[in-house]
Amino acid sequence: MSKENIVTRENTAVSENAVSEPTVNNDVGASATNSVTHPAFTLNVRPDNIGIITIDVVGDKVNTLKAEFADQIATILQQAHALPKLQGLVIVSGKPDSFIAGADITMIAACRTAHDARVLAQKGQSILAQIAAFPVPVVAAIHGACLGGGLELALACHSRICSLDDKTVLGLPEVQLGLLPGSGGTQRLPRLVGVSKALDMILTGKQIRPRQALKMGLVDDVVPRDILLDVAIQRAKAGWLNRRALPWQERLLSGPLGKALLFRIVRKKTLAKTRGHYPAAERIIDVVRKGLDQGGPSGYEAEARAFGELAMSPQSAALRSLFFATTSLKKETGSAATARAIHRVGVLGGGLMGGGIANVTATRAGLPVRIKDINPQGINQALKYTWDALGKRVRSKRMRPTEQQRQMMLISGSTDYRGFERVDIVVEAVFEDLSLKQQMVADIERFGAAHTIFASNTSSLPISQIAALAQRPEQVIGLHYFSPVDKMPLVEVIPHEKTSEETIATTVALARKQGKTAIVVADRAGFYVNRILAPYINEAARCLLDGEPIESVDNALVDFGFPVGPMMLLDEVGIDVATKIMPILVEQLGPRFAAPPSFDVILKDGRKGRKNGRGFYLYSNPTKNSSPTKNGNSPAKRNSFKWRKNKVKPVDASIYTLLGVTPKAHLGAGVITQRCTMLMLNEAVRCLDESIIRNPRDGDIGAVFGIGFPPFLGGPFRYLDSLGADKVVQALRLLVQQYGERFEPCQRLVTMAEQQQQFYPVDANIDEVTDVAS
């Protein structure tokens, strides 16, 4: 055993007051619904005097920590403490692929005040303090997800051993819900791995893989899964060992000067990223520093207080609403029918989108994929997409080369339709050309199986027109991905009037296997995401034509909470691609979607954005990849999270001369934001009224995951409820007077304002709202 892989007994400053003792039966399994007769925590003592505490919440696929489990843990520890010959404890999970996925955040629903939530955190701190102060070594044997409260429990143990397995990840993701770790995580983690690494983990919510966890000192050993328990038992038998020293860099940063510099830099970078919209990030910094500066008692007290206050914040409520919305959506099939089994998938087109779709199908769904492209180079490009993605995992030691080869063997390609007779669903990702897509439908009906579904990745063409000449129109559907496919979580599933229920259910099932969140939307121009994005983009362009500088427009919307400004978005998407959908929207939905004349002038000047190095901003190295149009891309599709990392680019000032505009900031950020976002909100309500989306929940998910609507606002409909329909109607009518009829509030919004209605039930907890009437 390496001297660096050690066990340490932690001194804790948290109160160790015992909690009440329930009657428990330690000889039976656990149950989330009946914790008295079926405890989630059981203790078995081996002949060698090592106690094994098993966590198994019966009835749940994964373990989550619930408030009622506190009494069970206290009882287990008291029973173990009473064993005079006990040499150590090992905590393991009874689930096959999960340690503890986190705390059950529905507990927050029972908290009506910040004080209630603070008490909840203090209870968690007290229980974990008992583990930390236990008189014999306690070792966590971790396999599978060890997140949130699960990692906080592991941190309270004296040693952590984890399995070398892709399913094993460790992290503190509470910040993603507008919270901070409330059971000691902000205090124990910095002392274990160093303040710099701890802040990075807690502020980002990132998940750490086993080898990385070992390197940073988060775990003491990484072993194959089949010997995990044996190694943990031996570690417990080894007794108390000295704690491994922190690396010199972390020791330097823990000193007065290093610490002051580190926190100053971290706070500056955090505010630059969050723009002040995510108070949890700032509270995390404060709480971690307080614990380091003033010691454990002050740190734990600050952690509990901050947890309580954040739990009651509107930002956390909005983020938790999104969490529960996506969780409920994942349980739905999108149809009353049963999905057909999917064994093989076909992809038409080997471009950016086709390659991405093949990638997630093979690597996430684990399904064989057959790619068809007219050019062998297209097939090679698609194969390279997945090879490169898997190669990154191999280089970071998150995957073995043999596994890379195995997953690559799931993807094959051809310039003809050989192999498509065995395919269950085909995803088409070719040019946005109606006649071409109709020909693809005919080809699949000829060369595919009788049951093969044809799913088009179109971003603008009506699915009914794509299916117009089909012999089996009930098996034609839209499946709209967003780029980059392996990063963007949303897909729109678009049935037309003849699409069968089985086709809908099967398509949703495929999307879910690919790791996607799927919303079912109606077959009308722009579907949902691009339809609400179009007026937002148009209005930003009008602000530019009014003389507002490009950077002022973009900064206003980024400050509001979007990941990237609308002008930068146009450059990233491709100005030609972004404007292509506008005529279709105007034709089907009316003149309010008419693009400002500036787009025609810009396109005639040869400006397409980043891809050809000419757009609203200057680019020294334009990207060499092909036009997004070729791959079925759309304005929302290029809304990659990587934009957050882009450095500020200089504006191409020549565009002002081209447009005949003299730039001068005069509107103000509030005016710009209101003009752009009010149109988006109004259009979202129209989509709900026209049944483009099934309910407000789907509309919120689509906007946040599809175009980056500020998550801390919860989505357009949560945001509308927070503003009040009457205030929104009032604002829109004022904008009508100032800028024209395009701001006319839709009738549903007017009616809701008159009747003082909301989109979500007023008295319902966000945890309880899984669906709402449209």
UniProtKB/Swiss-Prot annotation:
Region (Disordered): 1-31, 617-641
Top-level taxon: Bacteria
Stretches for region 3-hydroxyacyl-CoA dehydrogenase: 340-774
GO cellular component: cytoplasm
Annotated compartments: Cytoplasm
Pathway membership: Lipid metabolism; fatty acid beta-oxidation
Catalytic activity: a (3S)-3-hydroxyacyl-CoA = a (2E)-enoyl-CoA + H2O; a 4-saturated-(3S)-3-hydroxyacyl-CoA = a (3E)-enoyl-CoA + H2O; a (3S)-3-hydroxyacyl-CoA + NAD(+) = a 3-oxoacyl-CoA + NADH + H(+); (3S)-3-hydroxybutanoyl-CoA = (3R)-3-hydroxybutanoyl-CoA
One annotated GO biological process: fatty acid beta-oxidation
Compositionally biased tracts (Polar residues): 8-31, 620-637
Alphabetical UniProt keywords: Cytoplasm, Fatty acid metabolism, Isomerase, Lipid degradation, Lipid metabolism, Lyase, Multifunctional enzyme, NAD, Oxidoreductase
Name of the molecule in the record: Fatty acid oxidation complex subunit alpha
